[in-house]
UniProtKB/Swiss-Prot annotation:
The gene is rplW. One of its GO terms (biological process) is translation. Part of the 50S ribosomal subunit. Contacts protein L29, and trigger factor when it is bound to the ribosome. This is Large ribosomal subunit protein uL23. Belongs to the universal ribosomal protein uL23 family. One of the early assembly proteins it binds 23S rRNA. One of the proteins that surrounds the polypeptide exit tunnel on the outside of the ribosome. Forms the main docking site for trigger factor binding to the ribosome. Gene3D superfamilies: 3.30.70.330. The keyword rRNA-binding applies. Transmembrane segments: none annotated. Keywords: Ribonucleoprotein, Ribosomal protein, RNA-binding, rRNA-binding. GO terms for cellular component: ribonucleoprotein complex; ribosome. One of its GO terms (molecular function) is rRNA binding. It comes from Onion yellows phytoplasma (strain OY-M).
Length: 96
């Protein structure tokens, strides 16, 4: 069980992801870089008790950032977009 919580790190909440939730019932999560689609699907079904129809993954590359004289990179991560069965939903925020 703890393995599943190590794979799924956090939900990604933006205006675009909220539109995906409303229109297509797709949820976006930040996941471990070593996770594959099958592991992500099993983890989400176990944690949230929903039927996941599909999982799309994408590696987000680090971006160069500069603040005054300081330069650096943001950290890269892997993101998963998961489609949930119709009629089911994942309660990400308590206010929804």
């Amino acid at each position: 069980m703890n393995k599943y919580y190590d794979l799924v790190k956090a939900p990604i909440i933006t205006e675009l992801t909220n539109k995906l939730i409303e229109r297509q019932n797709k949820y976006t999560f930040k996941v471990a870089k070593t996770a594959n689609k099958v592991e992500i699907k099993k983890a989400l079904e176990s944690i949230f008790q929903v039927k996941v129809l599909s999982v799309n993954t994408r590696n987000v590359l680090p971006q160069f950032k500069r603040k005054g004289k300081f330069e650096g990179y943001t950290s890269g991560y892997k993101k998963a977009i998961c489609k949930v069965a119709p009629g089911q939903k994942i309660e990400i925020l308590a206010n929804e």
